[in-house]
């Protein structure tokens, strides 16, 4: 699997390849020796351009993240608080906690109203496209986990949903 870089510092923004890179030319698959067995390797490349097709593998594959402290988050991107840079713009991501397995069962958290509503919203991807918005330069929402449609958290400019950054 090959993935793009998620810049955490301003100096890393110049190291991204998406939206400006020439297509990578590598074989889609190859034979790999495995003792007496012949294995077949498959290359899984990320998308290199921002586009309208967005989907969340965590929601589609009914996955979640349980932190070291028992807190349940819907995905890696929302599992902790951190800054990152997308297309040169700083974004502060706040951890999105949907429950704690020390207080409730995983089944209760998964079927809770907030989590069900969040998954439905992500499944239909009802978020604006912040990256290519004409107001993006003067919008305060895009600097945080929010968007102008009132979503908090917002997956509007999630690089994982774009398949620019891939999960293992």
Whereabouts are the PLM-identified features?
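Flexible mid-to-C-terminal extensions adjoining Fe-S/redox cofactors in radical SAM and related proteins
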Residues: 77-168
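Radical SAM enzyme [4Fe-4S]-AdoMet core and its adjacent flexible, acidic
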Residues: 1-104
């Amino acid at each position: 699997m090959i993935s793009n870089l998620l810049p955490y510092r301003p100096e890393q923004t110049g190291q991204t390849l998406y939206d400006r890179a020439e297509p990578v030319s590598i074989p889609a698959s190859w034979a790999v020796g495995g003792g007496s067995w012949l294995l077949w390797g498959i290359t899984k490349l990320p998308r290199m351009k921002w586009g309208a097709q967005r989907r969340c593998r965590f929601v589609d594959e009914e996955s979640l993240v349980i932190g070291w402290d028992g807190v349940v988050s819907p995905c890696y991107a929302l599992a902790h608080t951190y800054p990152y840079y997308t297309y040169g713009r700083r974004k502060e991501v706040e951890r999105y906690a949907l429950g704690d397995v020390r207080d409730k069962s995983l089944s209760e958290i998964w079927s809770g109203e907030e989590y069900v509503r969040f998954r439905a919203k992500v499944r239909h991807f009802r978020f604006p496209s912040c990256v290519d918005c004409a107001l993006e330069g003067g919008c305060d929402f895009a600097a945080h986990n929010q968007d102008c449609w009132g979503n908090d958290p917002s997956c509007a400019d999630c690089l994982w949903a774009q398949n620019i950054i891939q999960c293992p």
